[in-house]
Amino acid sequence: MKIRVLKQAFLAFVAMAFAATSSLAATATDPVLAEVTTGEWRSADEKSRDAARKPIENLQFWGLKPGASILEVQPGAGWWTRILAPYAARTGGRYSATAADLANPSITEAARKGRADFAARFADEKIYGKVELVNWGATAAPLAANSYDFILLSRVIHGWMRVEGLLDRHFANLAGSLKPGGVLAIEQHRENPGPQDPMAESGYVTEAFVIEAAERTGLRLAARSEINANPKDTKDHPFGVWTLPPTRITVPYGSGKAPDPNFDRSKYDAIGESDRMTLRFVKAIP
């Protein structure tokens, strides 16, 4: 009896030890990723959003690896850029970002300036390595085929839905530019399941819509995560997702109106950043 009890206790100990080891392995952080997320080149404001945006958890879920060739699509002000470019530089990888199409004869001066400003902001090669900008837009030439290990789409898909045919064009372009086995990582404001507004006026898109669009190109949904879920997000805000932090608008988006000083923001600030889907697609290896 005593021997059986001791044996059971020993087996329980081994099981707990194995579980603890497995848990640690599953949550072990890439040391370079940890380093670049705390880099002094990231502002205090950018770092303050880490609790909501969870950069390390997301990038590890998506499967970012040292030495990867990375493409960030429509990087905006560069919140992800200040993590991805230094990571690529420190691991022997390559970082590229899409930018205004300089080959477009109709390019506006504002678009040209935006591209130049982005390039200047990330020109320090000691921090960011060599940042490559690639032409992108409705009429841009296709990206180089089989060029990237990792492509990030962060909260941009809703904008593509407002131009007929653009969504499918962009997804096909990105799928073609992925190397076999490469990852398309998606973070997008998430609408509740149901019919999709074809124009995505609120900024929210259903998971089913995004998955179908990506899979039309032959990409395979490898995993989805609730890392960026926010159950407090009711998704019925007066000015769409942009009512929430960090944009926090108080008048209709793009209206050109002055901010409304009497708009009560407290309810929306309490919600925090949007509820977002987190998806990982993989390109098949022939």
Residue ranges and their predicted role:
Residues 167-180:
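A short glycine-rich, Lys/Arg-flanked "PGG" loop and its adjoining helix->strand segment in the class I
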Residues 33-61, 65:
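Class I SAM-dependent methyltransferase Rossmann-like catalytic core
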Residues 263-286:
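C-terminal lobe and adjacent flexible extensions of AdoMet/dcAdoMet transferase-like proteins
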Residues 181-189:
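Conserved beta-strand signature within the Rossmann-like core of class I S-adenosyl-L-methionine
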Residues 67-76:
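Conserved class I S-adenosyl-L-methionine
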Residues 197-224:
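Conserved Class I S-adenosyl-L-methionine
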Residues 141-151:
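A short acidic, Gly/Pro-enriched loop at the edge of an enzyme's catalytic core
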Residues 89, 160-161, 178-180:
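Helix-to-beta-strand junctions that scaffold the AdoMet/dcAdoMet cofactor pocket
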